[in-house]
Amino acid sequence: MNLQEEIKKRRTFAIISHPDAGKTTITEQLLYFGGEIREAGTVKGKKTGTFAKSDWMDIEKQRGISVTSSVMQFDYDGKRVNILDTPGHEDFSEDTYRTLMAVDAAVMVVDSAKGIEAQTKKLFEVVKHRGIPVFTFMNKLDRDGREPLDLLQELEEVLGIASYPMNWPIGMGKAFEGLYDLYNQRLELYKGDERFASLEDGDKLFGSNPFYEQVKEDIELLNEAGNEFSEEAILAGDLTPVFFGSALTNFGVQTFLETFLKFAPEPHGHKKTDGEIVDPYDKDFSGFVFKIQANMDPRHRDRIAFVRIVSGEFERGMSVNLPRTGKTAKLSNVTQFMAESRENVTNAVAGDIIGVYDTGTYQVGDTLTVGKNKFEFEPLPTFTPEIFMKVSAKNVMKQKSFHKGIEQLVQEGAIQLYTNYQTGEYMLGAVGQLQFEVFKHRMEGEYNAEVVMTPMGKKTVRWISPDDLDERMSSSRNILAKDRFDQPVFLFENDFALRWFADKYPDVKLEEKM
């Protein structure tokens, strides 16, 4: 098979949702259909001891939430599928936002009892901004939930996207009978030995079931007043196909997967800093680092840089340019993933995600190119932290482990490090409280370094030019520090302190990052 045909087979997407909507469960079921796991591990592992395949980090297993983005790959129906399972918890939005830069489509999982929730809305905005297609899975039909027409109406009003139901539930909860498949024009049965039946058999199967009568009325209404199906509108991100089902009971998931793969886009190009788009079918390899993960194998204290291949083909042992540093690197130890298990890869193509063993060479956002190509892709989004803590080693004898742990975890980008210019104290900044909990847990569990963390509260962060640096500007209300790139930065106590400083030093330009 030639390079172009290989690239055309790729389907790379992220799963987004509010916490507990069933995102990890549907990921499990997709892997089950892809033949990667023998049984779909349920996320209820907190009690049973069976943990979800995609939640590989110790703290994720304990808490039943995804706090890092897992990458998983399988083949199905002639396609090579790359799933990125993103953190649903809002404190990890930075990791999630970056992950969404590395995919060509998104699957939005919604709890049918709760509808569109806060984190779903936030993540949808990012996806919408990127202009990539969104496929919606209305989950948990095995429980009582809201009326399907209400769910569609809310989806359209809250998210501002048109919807098209690919199937329609017949009852829900204990009265759930199956799905009326509008796209495939058949019935999918929840009970009994037969999985499918023709629409003509509906009246015979369900007799005078009031739920089935309601379904027929709803579908008549949708045919008259609903949106038209349009593959063009789906690919443009203007129309979301909506699938109903139950990930926990594995109902409707296979139909979703098969239909999704028909309409999900091939790998797309990516924009360079000069605005030009790199075509995935360019023969020259290029890619970008969207995530760095330390200790995927705690026994080896390793670090993996996750790379989305944008164009061409990766071959083991190839040399790549790193335009940020002007140096080259050899890609010899490269893996592909099934959550915590991994295998060496000899070649991969545009659309694939590879993991490059990293000894400190790479940073999140780095571009990799070959030959004379030394361009850079557009920068990935970064977030200014809002809450801060001082951090120090509890045991002075563990300073080496403490420094190694901080260095590696900070390079992942979920937490940011600042050093007080005058005292040398370490200060950590994060978007939310959970990031500090995860940091503390991982320092102790992965680096055997207990830490003391002292809250500093919220701070307003502004960078200044090194030319304007004067240590006398620092005070308790505006702490002068340096970030991990040694750039000078002020941590202001509040907006009042910021305005006071700006009035006192009008010639000092204060810069705010995203």
Swiss-Prot record:
GO terms for cellular component: cytosol. GO terms for biological process: regulation of translational termination. This is Peptide chain release factor 3. The keyword Nucleotide-binding applies. Belongs to the TRAFAC class translation factor GTPase superfamily. Classic translation factor GTPase family. PrfC subfamily. It comes from Streptococcus gordonii (strain Challis / ATCC 35105 / BCRC 15272 / CH1 / DL1 / V288). HAMAP family: Rel_fac_3. It is found in: Cytoplasm. Keywords: Cytoplasm, GTP-binding, Nucleotide-binding, Protein biosynthesis. GTP binds at residues 17-24, 85-89, 139-142. One of its GO terms (molecular function) is translation release factor activity, codon specific. The gene is prfC. The keyword Transit peptide does not apply. Pfam families: EF-G_D2, GTP_EFTU, RF3_C. Increases the formation of ribosomal termination complexes and stimulates activities of RF-1 and RF-2. It binds guanine nucleotides and has strong preference for UGA stop codons. It may interact directly with the ribosome. The stimulation of RF-1 and RF-2 is significantly reduced by GTP and GDP, but not by GMP.
